[in-house]
């Protein structure tokens, strides 16, 4: 790999390490609430090793190595470097790598799925390892995987048969995408939900589905049979269920939730925790699904939580979930504003560009809250969440939206933002946080929350008039496709689904944010149109920041595989293309001050005409969004793929010219140092916070001895 190619994989130096500030919100809880939050926090973080195993085979050993080195020198890294003969600069490089590693819970970026490697030379890491026998033993297990791979494809997560890395299919280097697809369809047919599974291909060519559970023989199972003979191209082979994947961790999680249940604050929480315990002890996704039914009924709790194998972005097939869990406190002041948005939703949704037949018969008002996060376990912390992901619960029972306030407000050092014109920097700095809050609210509440899937819910039963089907607004013809019995949005759209849905939700936000009555709900303006007032500034930055995100997205596109590595960023690139194609010079990219096409792109800037948002920007978004939505609603995968591939295609100018400049100017993503809680005898629960530094990040995990 040449130096230029290698540079994009080097660990951030320095990483942007910030505190997830929580103290005043935690201290406002009473003793019972603190204990409830404490045990949920511990349950969530007890899954850390699951996250590590879900990233790469070497991640768990690297994690242990970082903590072992810290313990061996009692956190005095300068002394460790001196005794190992390693310079202070190289020790700093190791600490920078360690902070990014722990912040991503593995050695592939949680946002982008590309590997990052230390800047410290390998012989210096070996020297650090030699200072401690346990560290040296660990080092020998991962030293060949710490740095760049000989095959560039292995620098990215993805399907093994495409040369990429995926530990959702452990010890199975020759497993094919067709085999993954075939077995996924079989499991769906048998009624086994795949979120809490991994799959291994054995040397004999048979398949083992590894189910996460605290026991190897659960008292009850979601499906009766555990062994299946295969047919078709795999005749003679078999598939069997193997319980007890992540057994130690699942037992710890179940034990902590058993303790949390003792402090549940109402009956919904009591029932929810009971289902969580069954889900993780027995490996039951059916129980997890039931936990979410109780969770959505627990409206506006003082202590909010969710936990499980939730998001499926990182499984290349898009069906297996990553471990995730959080404990958080409600921010009542911010939640009031979001509550008004929820109440106004029935008036806002009809403004979207599709007929009523493509919308739910009744909007299920979600619980929309702003949270201050105590703990978020997983590979990265989002700014907002819309769950559960189970289609039938979302369609028929409801869902919750949460905005993570202290994630949104976590401050990084102020500096000029790449690709923004000098004359836009001040308004961008002033409005980027409010604009992002508007975007997150609309994205999560109305974006993910709106829309109907046209379904044959069971043989011969439909959730629309099949005798007189609605007109497809894209084709002008009657609808001719829909979801068949047993099909879900995820099963039909597969690996493309997560990015496509994020694009749909982002587009809903772009469609609705030009509505000044909505901006007023968030506290901007009086509802009257004024593109040059405060509300107009927020609207302008909603659009400008989306265009900028589309350029920045190229960092997450791999030129070798020509593959997107991050669902949200692929979506934002598509929306930037919508802006660029809107016409009328609404949005243009200027290569240099004199617009010289042959200039280097160090002065590349976005020109977006705020006055043309209502005349060019929003109409272009609406036309794009209508197609996205209708293709999803009608299960039209072929049309959706052709359409989405067009907008997410990276041409040679973006690949060869723009992308290298994006990488050169890229700012490190934040990694968050989170507090710990400890039971303190009769004094209740102690909250311990740490400094925002690589050393503080490592210390916070060293003190989680239960992991």
Q: What do these predicted ranges mean?
A:
Residues 27, 34-39, 60, 64, ...:
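Solvent-exposed, polar/charged alpha-helical surfaces in well-ordered, non-transmembrane soluble domains
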Residues 41-56, 278-291:
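Short amphipathic alpha-helical segments at helix boundaries and their inter-helical linkers
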Residues 16, 27, 31, 56, ...:
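Soluble non-cytosolic domains of exported or imported proteins
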Residues 95-98, 102-218, 225, 236-436:
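Contiguous, non-catalytic segments that form substrate-binding/exosite surfaces or channel walls
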Residues 442, 446-447:
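Short active-site segment of divalent metal-dependent hydrolases/proteases
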Residues 8-11, 33, 42-43, 49-119, ...:
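Zinc-dependent metallohydrolase catalytic domains
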Residues 1-8:
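Eukaryotic N-terminal low-complexity, Ser/Thr- and Lys/Arg-rich leader segments
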Residues 14-42:
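Mature N-terminal segment immediately following signal peptide/propeptide cleavage
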């Amino acid at each position: 790999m040449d130096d230029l190619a290698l540079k994009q994989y080097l660990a951030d130096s320095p990483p942007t390490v910030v505190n997830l500030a929580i103290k005043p919100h935690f201290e406002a809880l009473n003793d019972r609430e603190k204990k409830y939050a404490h045990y949920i926090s511990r349950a969530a973080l007890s899954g850390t090793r699951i996250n590590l195993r879900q990233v790469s085979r070497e991640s768990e050993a690297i994690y242990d190595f970082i903590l072992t080195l810290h313990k061996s020198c009692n956190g005095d890294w300068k002394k460790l470097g001196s005794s190992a003969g390693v310079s202070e600069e190289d020790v700093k490089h190791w600490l920078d790598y360690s902070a990014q590693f722990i912040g991503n819970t593995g050695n592939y970026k949680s946002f982008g799925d590309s590997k990052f490697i230390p800047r410290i030379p390998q012989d210096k890491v070996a020297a650090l390892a030699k200072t401690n026998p346990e560290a040296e033993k660990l080092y020998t297990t991962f030293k060949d995987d710490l740095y760049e791979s000989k095959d560039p494809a292995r620098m990215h997560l993805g399907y093994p048969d495409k040369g990429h890395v995926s530990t959702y299919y452990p010890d199975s280097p020759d497993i094919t995408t067709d085999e993954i697809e075939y077995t996924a369809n079989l499991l769906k047919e048998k009624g086994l939900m795949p979120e809490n599974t991994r799959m291994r291909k054995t040397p004999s060519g048979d398949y083992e589905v590894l189910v996460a559970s605290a026991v190897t023989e659960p008292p009850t199972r979601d499906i009766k049979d555990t062994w299946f003979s295969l047919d078709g191209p795999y005749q003679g082979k078999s598939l069997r269920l193997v319980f007890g994947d992540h057994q130690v961790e699942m037992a710890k999680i179940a034990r902590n939730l058993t303790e949390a249940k003792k402090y549940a604050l109402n009956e919904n929480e009591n029932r929810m925790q009971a289902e969580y315990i069954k889900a993780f002890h027995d490996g039951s996704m059916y129980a997890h699904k039931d936990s979410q039914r109780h969770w959505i009924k627990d409206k506006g709790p003082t202590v909010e939580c969710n936990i499980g194998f939730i998001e499926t972005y990182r499984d290349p097939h898009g069906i297996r979930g990553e471990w995730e869990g959080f404990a958080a406190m409600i921010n009542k002041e911010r939640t009031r504003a979001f509550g008004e948005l929820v109440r106004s939703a029935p008036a806002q949704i009809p403004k979207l560009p599709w007929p009523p037949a493509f919308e739910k018969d009744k909007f299920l008002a979600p619980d929309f809250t702003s949270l201050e996060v105590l703990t978020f376990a997983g590979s990265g912390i989002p700014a907002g969440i819309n769950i559960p992901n189970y289609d039938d619960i979302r369609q028929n029972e409801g869902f919750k939206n949460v905005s993570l306030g202290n994630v949104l407000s976590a401050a990084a050092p102020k500096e000029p933002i790449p690709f923004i014109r000098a004359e836009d920097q001040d308004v961008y700095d002033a409005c980027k946080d409010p604009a992002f809050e508007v975007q997150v609210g609309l994205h999560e509440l109305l974006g993910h929350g709106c829309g109907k899937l046209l379904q044959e819910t069971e043989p011969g039963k439909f959730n629309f008039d099949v005798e007189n089907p609605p007109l497809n607004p894209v084709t002008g013809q009657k609808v001719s496709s829909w979801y068949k019995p047993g099909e879900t949005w995820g099963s039909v759209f597969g690996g493309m689904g997560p990015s496509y849905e994020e694009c749909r939700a982002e587009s809903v936000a772009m469609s609705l944010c030009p509505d000044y009555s909505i901006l007023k709900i968030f506290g901007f303006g009086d509802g009257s149109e004024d593109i040059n007032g405060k509300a107009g500034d927020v609207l302008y930055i909603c659009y400008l920041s989306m265009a900028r995100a589309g350029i920045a997205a190229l960092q997450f596109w791999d030129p070798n595989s020509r593959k997107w590595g991050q669902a949200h960023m692929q979506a934002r690139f598509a929306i930037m293309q919508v802006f660029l194609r809107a016409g009328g010079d609404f949005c243009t990219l200027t290569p240099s001050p004199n617009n010289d096409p042959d200039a280097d792109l160090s002065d590349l800037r976005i020109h977006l005409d705020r006055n043309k948002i209502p005349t060019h920007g929003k109409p272009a978004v609406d036309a794009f969004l209508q197609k996205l939505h209708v293709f999803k609603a009608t299960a039209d995968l072929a049309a959706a793929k052709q359409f989405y591939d067009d907008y997410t295609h990276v041409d040679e100018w973006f690949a060869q010219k723009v992308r290298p400049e994006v990488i050169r100017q890229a700012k490190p993503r934040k990694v968050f140092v989170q507090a710990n809680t400890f039971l303190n005898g009769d004094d209740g629960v102690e909250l311990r916070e740490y400094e925002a530094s690589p050393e503080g990040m490592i210390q916070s995990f060293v003190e989680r001895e239960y992991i």
